Amino acid sequence: MLLPFREAGASFDRGGPGALYERAQAFIHDHLRDPDLSIDQISMALGCTKRYLHMLFSDRGITVSEYIWRARLLNCRQELEIPGNKTITDVAFSWGFSSSSHFSRIFRKYFGIMPSSIHRSQQRNGLQDGAAQPPA
């Protein structure tokens, strides 16, 4: 007996591949901070196979894993560009990285600069901005 697509675990009946891709993106962004975010978890949540999920992203020239890493890296960079008290390790761990050295390596590979350079620059700017303001 053949099962309907939904019961078989595919989401072809919910607006097609474009809609499923958008749902995958939304799920990923909602769970970026989870260090255990996986392709298995995403495909189960969307009700599709891992193979189909891979195909959705592959058709757009990126793998699911690359999409997750890029999104995490962009969020980390944005957070590092805000002067504050967070360390690089705190930022990396808060966005799902489990090793600060691994984070620094892939950050440099992706952006061409070490996260410490951005962090130091923003810390200096934050101190200068704070020093230029009159006391309250």
Language model segments and positions:
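An amphipathic alpha-helical interaction segment
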Residues: 1-11
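Short hydrophobic/aromatic patch on the recognition helix
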Residues: 52-54, 102-103, 107
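A short, Lys/Arg-enriched amphipathic alpha-helix from helix-turn-helix/homeodomain DNA-binding modules
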Residues: 12-37, 43-46, 67-86
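Residues within the alpha-helical elements of helix-turn-helix
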Residues: 45, 94-95, 110
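Conserved hydrophobic/aromatic pocket- or pore-lining residues that grip, position, or stack substrates
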Residues: 1, 28, 53
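A secondary-structure capping/hinge motif
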Residues: 57-63, 106-118
